[in-house]
C-alpha cells in the first residue's frame, strides 16, 4: 500500500496509506525511499496497544518515537496528531498540502479512540482549495535540476513524469542535485542538510500553540492526540477549585512550534499525560539514571532540557478526566510541600 501511494504521488497524484504501528514498521524502508527521493507521502498511523500483537483493538499512543526515529539514517518528516474526529477531517487535508509543498513525508498519528469513536460536527461546506491542484505538465525550464535545492529552505521544484524536459532518474541511493547516484565525499551530507532544512522551513510556518488556562502557574499539563478533551475537562475542574493549573496540547510533534520553551518556563512544573509506557519512579529499581519516560516527555526533556515529568499508562483504555484531576491535585500539593520545606531549611 505504501509503495502504491508513493507511485501515485510520483506520477503527480498525492495518495495516502493508512496503517497501525506494526504495519508502519513494515513500511519503514519505503518511508525512507520517499524521504530520500523527496516524493510527497501522507501516512496515517492509527495507534493501538503493543508491543507485538499486543492489544490490537485497544487504544495507545506508543508510536511517537518510532515514527520520528524509526527509519535507518536521517529521515526528517512532519508528524502531526489530531485531537478530535473533526480535527481528523481537516488534518488529512493539511497533511496533503504540507507533503506536496515541502516534498516530504507527513505522518498523521491517530489512535483507536478516534478511529472507533463518534463526534457530531457541522458538515463542512466544500472548499475547492482542499483538492490537489491539476497535474503540472508545463515544460521544465532549461537547466533546471530535479533536486535544485534552495540554499535557504532546501525546497526544489517537483518534476512530474511527462513534463517536457523533466526526464530524470528516481533513486533511493545518495544522489546529486541532478538525481545521479554518487558516492563522493559530501554528496550524502549535502542531501541530508537540504532535506533537514525543509523541516526548518516548515517549522517557521507554525504558530505557537495557545495555553488552555492562565499563561503561568504551578502546573502545566501537556498532551497530544485524543487525550485533549479529558485533560481540558480535568483542568476546568481543578481551576474551579482555585488550583493554578493549565494545559497545552500539541498538534505538531515534529517539528514542534517555536515558543514552547518560553511557555514551559512560566510554570513551576511540567508534566505530560499520555497513553504509552513510562516507568513508575516509586519502584526501588527505578532511578534517574535508568528511568524511561513517556514519549512526549522524553522529547521535551531532550529538546528543551526541561525537567518534564510524565503520567501515563498502557491499560488500553481512554484516560478519564477524574484520574487526571486527582493527579493534578497530588502534584500541586507536592509542589506546595516542597516550597514549605525549602522555606523551613532557610
Feature annotation, model-predicted:
Residues 73-74, 215:
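Short glycine-enriched loop/turn motifs at secondary-structure junctions
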Residues 66-73, 301-304:
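Short, conserved catalytic or adaptor-binding loops enriched in Gly and charged residues
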Residues 91, 96-346:
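Flexible, low-complexity linker and terminal segments
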Residues 3, 12, 75, 86, ...:
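Hydrophobic alpha-helical context, especially transmembrane and signal-peptide helices
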Residues 1-69, 78-99, 240:
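Thiamine diphosphate
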Residues 16, 31, 54-57, 75, ...:
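Homeobox/homeodomain signature
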Amino acid at each position: 500500500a505504501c509503495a502504491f501511494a508513493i507511485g501515485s504521488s510520483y506520477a503527480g497524484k498525492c495518495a495516502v496509506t493508512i496503517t497501525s504501528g506494526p504495519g508502519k514498521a513494515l513500511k519503514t524502508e519505503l518511508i525512507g525511499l520517499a524521504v530520500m527521493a523527496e516524493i510527497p507521502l501522507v501516512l496515517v498511523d492509527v495507534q493501538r496497544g503493543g508491543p507485538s500483537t499486543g492489544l490490537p483493538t485497544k487504544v495507545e499512543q506508543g508510536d511517537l518515537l518510532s515514527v520520528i526515529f524509526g527509519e535507518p539514517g536521517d529521515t526528517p518528516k512532519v508528524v502531526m496528531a489530531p485531537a478530535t474526529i473533526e480535527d481528523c477531517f481537516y488534518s488529512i487535508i493539511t497533511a496533503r498540502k504540507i507533503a506536496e509543498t515541502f516534498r516530504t513525508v507527513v505522518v498523521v498519528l491517530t489512535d483507536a479512540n478516534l478511529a472507533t469513536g463518534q463526534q457530531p460536527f457541522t458538515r463542512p461546506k466544500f472548499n475547492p482549495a482542499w483538492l490537489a491542484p491539476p497535474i503540472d505538465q508545463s515544460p521544465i525550464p532549461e537547466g533546471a535540476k530535479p533536486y535544485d535545492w534552495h540554499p535557504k529552505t532546501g525546497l526544489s521544484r517537483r518534476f512530474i513524469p511527462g513534463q517536457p524536459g523533466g526526464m530524470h532518474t528516481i533513486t533511493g541511493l545518495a544522489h546529486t542535485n541532478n538525481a545521479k547516484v554518487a558516492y563522493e565525499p559530501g554528496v550524502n551530507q549535502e542531501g541530508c542538510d537540504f532535506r533537514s532544512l525543509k523541516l526548518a522551513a516548515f517549522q517557521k510556518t507554525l504558530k505557537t500553540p495557545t495555553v488552555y488556562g492562565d499563561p503561568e502557574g504551578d502546573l502545566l499539563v501537556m498532551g497530544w492526540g485524543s487525550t485533549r478533551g479529558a485533560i481540558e475537562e480535568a483542568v476546568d475542574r481543578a481551576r474551579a477549585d482555585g488550583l493554578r493549573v493549565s494545559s497545552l496540547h500539541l498538534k505538531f510533534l515534529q517539528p514542534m512550534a517555536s515558543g514552547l520553551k518560553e511557555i514551559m518556563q512560566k510554570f513551576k512544573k511540567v508534566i505530560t499525560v499520555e497513553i504509552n509506557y513510562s516507568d513508575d519512579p516509586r519502584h526501588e529499581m527505578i532511578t534517574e539514571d535508568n528511568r524511561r519516560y513517556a514519549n512526549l516527555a522524553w522529547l521535551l526533556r531532550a529538546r528543551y532540557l526541561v525537567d518534564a515529568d510524565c503520567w501515563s499508562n498502557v491499560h488500553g483504555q481512554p484516560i478519564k478526566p477524574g484520574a487526571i484531576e486527582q493527579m493534578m491535585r497530588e502534584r500541586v500539593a507536592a509542589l506546595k510541600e516542597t516550597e514549605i520545606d525549602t522555606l523551613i531549611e532557610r
